[in-house]
Structures are given as structure tokens and as C-alpha cells.
Amino acid sequence: MGQKVHPYGFRLGISKDWKARWINEKNYKEYLLEDLKIRDYIKKTYHSAGVSDIFIERPEPGKVSITIKCARPGVIIGRKGSEVKKLRAGLERLINRKFQLNIEEVKTPETDALLVAEDIASRIEKRASYKRAMKRAIFTAMRKGAKGIKIMVSGRLNGAEIARTEWYLEGRLPLQTLKSDIDYGYTTALTKMGIIGVRVWIYKGDVAQKKATEA
């Protein structure tokens, strides 16, 4: 039986970077649980900000650096920084450590796999046509520069009695090529008929080509 490898883990250390950048054998369990609490708190509290990624660094004991990548940074910052103050207070209560907070904007959320998946899931929850939502996401991503995109939804689609899987693919998607920059996102849509899973793969080109273009 064939097994699928996670696209991010497959490229980790080659074309993808670690989301938690620290090493500590003595306090590993404590730090790991702390990381999970931080991610969970930010995701739940600022879901409307379109949080794509959270990177956590621990340059030295007792210090934490948190970088939030989101589509709508204004939601997290708030008017005159009011929301950031609330976020800082919430994190201080949660981890009781000194920390540095950085907020980065996702320039093209249309080509961010997790944000695309969350947008489709949100539309499905609002009873929109899943096919229309998938086609719209594919069209927008390709127009914004994606080289290829695949979207897969599974569950009781349109309230069907039997769960099934449907997917659309546009462009190229070289999953087995390590140099290919592939973004992957997964989320779920909660409907009256049950949970519908949404998976998105977006191919953004080869890493070597992107570095040469940036240089």
C-alpha cells in the first residue's frame, strides 16, 4: 500500500526551514509544550488575521523570539497597537518568559497553501459550492504566479450519504523533486453533515531558480 510523505517534512533542511529553531535536551518537553501553547493561542485568538506560519526561536535560555506570518497584520496590530498589547499580555500569562514579537505580512496570500485551504473551508462552512470555491482558488493562484496547484476535498460533499474525495489539478506539481518549492496546507470545514477535509499543494517553482532571480 502506497504511503504519502508530507511535502514539508520531505524537504526539511533542503528547501524548507525549521518552524521551531532551538535545541535543548534538558528542557525539551517543557519547550515543546510551550511552543504548542503559543501556536494554539495565536491561531485561535487571531484566526481572522489569516495566520500562515509561526516561527519560534530560543537564542538563549529564558528568551523566546516569535515571528508571525499573516495575511492581515493590521488585525493583530490593531489601532495604535492595541491588539499587540493584548497579544503580549496573553503570551506573558501563557509562558511567563521574556519574548520578542515580530509580525510579517504574507505578500501573496493567494499562493499560500494554508490560507487557500482555510478560505475554501470557510466557504464550504457557509454552504457555498465546493467546486466553485476550488475553481476560484485555482484561477486566483495561477494568476498570482503559481506554477501549479492541486486542491483535494474529502468527506460528505454536498451532504451525500457516502463520503468521497474530489480533486482538481492545474499546472505542474513535482512532489518527488527536492529542489521544487512546494507549499502544503491542510484544514477542516465543520458542517452539519460532518467534517470535510481540505488539502492544498502549491508549486512555486524551483528553489535554485528563485534564488537566481532574487540575486
Swiss-Prot record:
Molecular function GO terms recorded: mRNA binding; rRNA binding; structural constituent of ribosome
Sequence ranges assigned to domain KH type-2 in this UniProt record: 38-107
SMART domains in the cross-refs: KH
Keywords: Ribonucleoprotein, Ribosomal protein, RNA-binding, rRNA-binding
Superkingdom in the source lineage: Bacteria
One GO term of the biological process aspect: translation
Subunit structure: Part of the 30S ribosomal subunit. Forms a tight complex with proteins S10 and S14.
Family that this chain belongs to: Belongs to the universal ribosomal protein uS3 family.
Summary of the function given for this chain in its UniProt record: Binds the lower part of the 30S subunit head. Binds mRNA in the 70S ribosome, positioning it for translation.
The protein, known as: Small ribosomal subunit protein uS3
Name of the encoding gene: rpsC
